[in-house]
Amino acid sequence: MGQKVNPNGFRLGIIRDWTSRWYDDSPVIAEKIKQDHVIRNYVQARLKREKAGIARIVIERTTKHIKINIYAARPGAVVGRKGEEINNLSQELSRITGKEVKIDVVEVIKPETEAQLIGENIAYQLENRVSFRRAMKQAIQQAMRAGAEGIRIRCAGRLGGAEIARAEQYKEGKIPLHTIRANVDYASVTAHTIAGTIGIKVWVYKGEVLVQRIDAIEEDELKRINERRGDSKSRPRDPRNKRRRRTKRS
């Protein structure tokens, strides 16, 4: 199952958090979800010209305002001179949403190991007629040098302008998709070339994460686990067992 499912969704609530962190049980929840989608598309398109390298966008909502955390490889391109770019972006999003928008920019320390940035970099090279093999191998080498424990890249489409579409992939290191505590970053990007669209999928393994959120497991589940293991503290001893043993010995 781990080979088919999205690795990000498979690890939600365990080692991966949601990109939309808010709760609403009103009938307008669908409109807010759609608004989050519009915000992400607008920010991506707006900052693509600046080549800021947006890894992910996290949206938090309150009753009065919307807080947007932008994880960027080049935070200076998002902020601009004296904060002009970020102020303009905040005002534009306020007009779209009708609420006050606060934007925080977080720097991505290792952009070479971010699956989204790797996919966008390969897509940019393919659109500029760079060999797909060269782009994939170069991205793998950069990721492994930056500290990734494993990476897999898969490109599908009319590679190299071929008449028949095909898929090719390159892999280095290990990608444990079934291990939930394994921090596997995943992204899917589309490159628009002259021959047609090329789908790019990237898996990056960054190591294991020790899950410290034991409170996520309910107490009754912990009791069941202890009972299965035969824990003496969770399972009281039956005094009749001693009597049976004594009768057998005698």
From Swiss-Prot:
Residues 240-250 have a biased composition (Basic residues). The keyword Ribonucleoprotein applies. SUPFAM superfamilies: Prokaryotic type KH domain (KH-domain type II), Ribosomal protein S3 C-terminal domain. SMART domains: KH. CDD domains: KH-II_30S_S3. PROSITE patterns: KH_TYPE_2, RIBOSOMAL_S3. Part of the 30S ribosomal subunit. Forms a tight complex with proteins S10 and S14. This is Small ribosomal subunit protein uS3. It comes from Chlorobium phaeobacteroides (strain DSM 266 / SMG 266 / 2430).
